[in-house]
Amino acid sequence: MATLEDKLQELLQPSVEDLGCELWGIECQRSGRFFTVRLYIDKKDGGVTVDDCADVSRQVSAVLDVEDPIADKYNLEVSSPGLNRPLFTLKQFENYIGQDISVHLRVPMFDRRKWQGKLEKIENDMLTLIVDNQPQVLVFGNIQKANVVPKFN
């Protein structure tokens, strides 16, 4: 069964692409009575501007008003993924092999939900992280949330 994020991705991706942006990912989050739909957009040149975010927000709002896929009232947020960009797809993970990432698992592995390490490789739907000089193999489907850990020199 498709998640709300999957449905929104399919519905909104063409509109975002029409504006010259890539729909990097979507997060839906409930906090009490409040519901937030967070869209991350990117551009090939990496230069997402405030105007890009405003344009996408207007376009996406119009689509959501017409299609009405969200039953509750919601707040829409549009931003770039930023330095500690969230990772949503295996293809996105592949772009960050050799870099540090942080992962939150749905189901704990070795009594841990939070892992951080260097992404060494991806085979099928298995990601290998080097954590404390030891390889840890994580199943992509068990990843609840992941992001790049930025390096500051």
UniProtKB/Swiss-Prot annotation:
<dbReference type="Pfam" id="PF02576">
    <property type="entry name" value="RimP_N"/>
</dbReference>
<keyword id="KW-0690">Ribosome biogenesis</keyword>
<dbReference type="InterPro" id="IPR028998">
    <property type="entry name" value="RimP_C"/>
</dbReference>
<dbReference type="InterPro" id="IPR028989">
    <property type="entry name" value="RimP_N"/>
</dbReference>
<dbReference type="GO" id="GO:0006412">
    <property type="term" value="P:translation"/>
</dbReference>
<dbReference type="Pfam" id="PF17384">
    <property type="entry name" value="DUF150_C"/>
</dbReference>
<dbReference type="InterPro" id="IPR035956">
    <property type="entry name" value="RimP_N_sf"/>
</dbReference>
<keyword id="KW-0963">Cytoplasm</keyword>
<comment type="function">
    <text>Required for maturation of 30S ribosomal subunits.</text>
</comment>
<dbReference type="InterPro" id="IPR036847">
    <property type="entry name" value="RimP_C_sf"/>
</dbReference>
<comment type="similarity">
    <text>Belongs to the RimP family.</text>
</comment>
<dbReference type="GO" id="GO:0005829">
    <property type="term" value="C:cytosol"/>
</dbReference>
<protein>
    <recommendedName>
        <fullName>Ribosome maturation factor RimP</fullName>
    </recommendedName>
</protein>
<dbReference type="GO" id="GO:0000028">
    <property type="term" value="P:ribosomal small subunit assembly"/>
</dbReference>
<dbReference type="InterPro" id="IPR003728">
    <property type="entry name" value="Ribosome_maturation_RimP"/>
</dbReference>
